[in-house]
């Protein structure tokens, strides 16, 4: 499920916050509280049919054989969000695209692994994301909003990526997205941090699953 992200810098010096606008689904007729609960649980089960796309979490290591990636949270000085927590968030937000999340203990960095809708046009997705970031942060001034797309080498292959930097005063907020494709499946690794080196360290903790 595609998400559009808004980067905002605010706070005492400046606090950076990622605003997530989730895509909506068709409205359902109102039912009793118990019926609503049953629908949510059923919806979750339907979306989780392809367990290979979900990947596998073993302690602090996440593996996804479909996209041939493995992420070691400890290697990036991060803590993995448990599968139970991700399941709870998925049900709560009625969004089942998030498959893995890890957060750092010190620098406030975060990495997500999300599976997008099959057949997602990556270049169109990136173009829309870039336009959203520029529009939502134009108040900072063009010189303080840097966002671009490029092709990078990731785990030995060329992949599409997006890099964004928002600056206010002495604080810069960084975000990097790396897009992976496997047949008709599309996934994105997203890293957010106020430390540029942490972005590289986090991506460096990804290896091939095989």
Regions flagged by a language model, labelled:
Residues 127-178:
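Signature of long, low-cysteine stretches enriched in small and polar/charged residues
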Residues 65-120:
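Secretory pathway targeting signatures of secreted, lumenal, and periplasmic proteins
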Residues 98-103, 172-182:
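Short, surface-exposed beta-strand/loop micro-motifs that present aromatic residues
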Residues 75-78, 183-210:
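Surface-exposed amphipathic alpha-helical segments
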Residues 24-74, 80-81:
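N-terminal, intrinsically disordered, polar/charged segments of Gram-positive cell-envelope systems
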Residues 56-61, 94-98, 153-164:
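Short, hydrophobic/aromatic-rich segments at coil-to-beta transitions
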């Amino acid at each position: 499920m595609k998400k559009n992200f808004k980067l905002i810098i605010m706070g005492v010096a400046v606090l950076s916050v990622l605003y997530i606008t989730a895509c909506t689904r068709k409205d359902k007729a109102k039912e009793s509280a118990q019926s609503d609960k049953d629908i949510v649980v059923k919806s979750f089960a339907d979306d989780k049919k392809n367990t290979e796309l979900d990947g596998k979490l073993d302690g602090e290591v996440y593996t996804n054989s479909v996209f041939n990636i493995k992420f070691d949270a400890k290697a990036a000085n991060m803590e993995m969000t448990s599968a139970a927590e991700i399941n709870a968030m998925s049900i709560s937000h009625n969004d089942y695209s998030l498959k893995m999340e890890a957060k750092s203990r010190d620098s406030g960095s975060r990495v997500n692994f999300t599976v997008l809708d099959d057949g997602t046009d990556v270049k169109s997705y990136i173009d829309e994301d870039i336009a959203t970031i520029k529009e939502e942060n134009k108040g900072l001034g063009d010189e303080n909003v840097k966002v671009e797309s490029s092709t990078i080498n990731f785990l030995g292959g060329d992949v599409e990526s997006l890099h964004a930097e928002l600056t206010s005063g002495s604080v810069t907020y960084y975000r990097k997205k790396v897009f992976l494709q496997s047949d008709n499946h599309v996934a994105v690794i997203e890293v957010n941090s106020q430390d540029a080196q942490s972005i590289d360290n986090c991506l460096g903790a990804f290896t091939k699953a095989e």
